[in-house]
Amino acid sequence: MTINLIKYGLTTAVQADLTKENGQILGRIIGQHRDWYQVITTAGERSAQVTGKLAYEAASPAAFPAVGDWVCLSSSADNQAQIEAIAPRQSVLARGAVNRQDGQIIATNINTIFICMSLNADFNVRRLERYLTIAWDSGALPVIVLTKADLCTDLATKLRAVADVSVGVPTITCSVETGQGLDELQPYLTTGQTVAFVGSSGVGKSTLINRLLGQDILATKSIRTDDNKGRHTTTSRQLIPLPTGACVIDTPGMRELQIFMGDLNQTFAEIAALATQCKFNDCTHTSEPGCAVRAAVEVGTVTSERLQSYQKLQREMSYQGLNSRQLEQAKIQRMFGGKQAMKRVKQRYHRD
């Protein structure tokens, strides 16, 4: 049976980005396990490893394949599939990794990011701000999915708290138990779309995906009765096709979400707007005279908790110590794998 890769998100742009040599085939990475990968092709799934050449030329871990990447495969003499090339990425969801400047790629080539947060004991708007920061920087559309609505007794209060930190971001309230809100997810799950599910451990990502699949493919565990939290189940990233023709990427719960690069101006739009009114262009909003942001805090327009969260994320973002040239190089490496790959894409674009 021939697999239709359009249902896995294949586009004409992807096909143009990858030049296949004789005998090579196109595929998309649907699973990653240490140094080998699961790849879906028109002929079905293959297990593959990167070639020595690709590994040697990789300038950083970001240049290695990740779940969601489109790749070219070849077969060696022993019929072992090898990854020869990676297509330029249309979007990259990444987070900072402890003691590493290059960050960790979570998923690539995604259209939408479902930021899942449960409405029970897991509810935390400061954590939501972190997820929004990496989501805005990814190039994909963030959507907030509030799960376990059936367990919530103060929904209106929580919705106001979410709205205060997520202006312009769609928010969906749902419950797998009652079916509430599940229809609102469908517009993002049409043929060719790829949606990544992110969120802390136990918020119900796998349970929600199983409901969308119509069968229990992903392992789940019940809620703990002592603290009303779900148990962490997913241990690796995987891309799964839905009956609707879309693909979803389930990701392990992230206990610590370090910020590598992120668009704080999107997540904290009101603070970014106020900052333009500060007396000094390099105002840190701590003790400088003429600070419009601190003035807003004093009158209650911006909460002190919101400002503290903004400042904390600023401090920990790894690009704080980088100059503009280094930041540009880091983003090129993450999206294209290097300047040479970016040049090839630009040359093809101008020819077209």
Curated annotation (Swiss-Prot):
Domain named CP-type G: residues: 100-257
Subcellular location: Cytoplasm
Keyword Transcription: no
Annotated Pfam families: RsgA_GTPase
Binding-site residues for Zn(2+), renumbered to this chain: C278, C283, H285, C291
Cofactor note: Binds 1 zinc ion per subunit.
EC number: 3.6.1.-
Entry-linked Gene3D superfamilies: P-loop containing nucleotide triphosphate hydrolases, Probable gtpase engc, domain 3
GO biological process: ribosomal small subunit biogenesis
InterPro entries: G_CP_dom, P-loop_NTPase, Ribosome_biogen_GTPase_RsgA, RsgA_GTPase_dom
Keywords: Cytoplasm, GTP-binding, Hydrolase, Metal-binding, Nucleotide-binding, Ribosome biogenesis, RNA-binding, rRNA-binding, Zinc
Residues reported to bind GTP: T147, K148, A149, D150, G199, S200, S201, G202, V203, G204, K205, S206, T207
MF GO annotations: GTP binding; GTPase activity; metal ion binding; rRNA binding
Any one annotated GO CC term: cytoplasm
Cofactor(s) listed in the protein's UniProt record: Zn(2+)
Database matches in SUPFAM superfamilies: P-loop containing nucleoside triphosphate hydrolases (SSF52540)
PROSITE patterns: ENGC_GTPASE, G_CP
Role: One of several proteins that assist in the late maturation steps of the functional core of the 30S ribosomal subunit. Helps release RbfA from mature subunits. May play a role in the assembly of ribosomal proteins into the subunit. Circularly permuted GTPase that catalyzes slow GTP hydrolysis, GTPase activity is stimulated by the 30S ribosomal subunit.
HAMAP family the UniProt entry points to: GTPase_RsgA (MF_01820)
Assembly behavior: Monomer. Associates with 30S ribosomal subunit, binds 16S rRNA.
NCBIfam families the record matches: ribosome small subunit-dependent GTPase A
Family membership noted in the UniProt record: Belongs to the TRAFAC class YlqF/YawG GTPase family. RsgA subfamily.
Protein name: Small ribosomal subunit biogenesis GTPase RsgA 2
Native species: Lactiplantibacillus plantarum (strain ATCC BAA-793 / NCIMB 8826 / WCFS1)
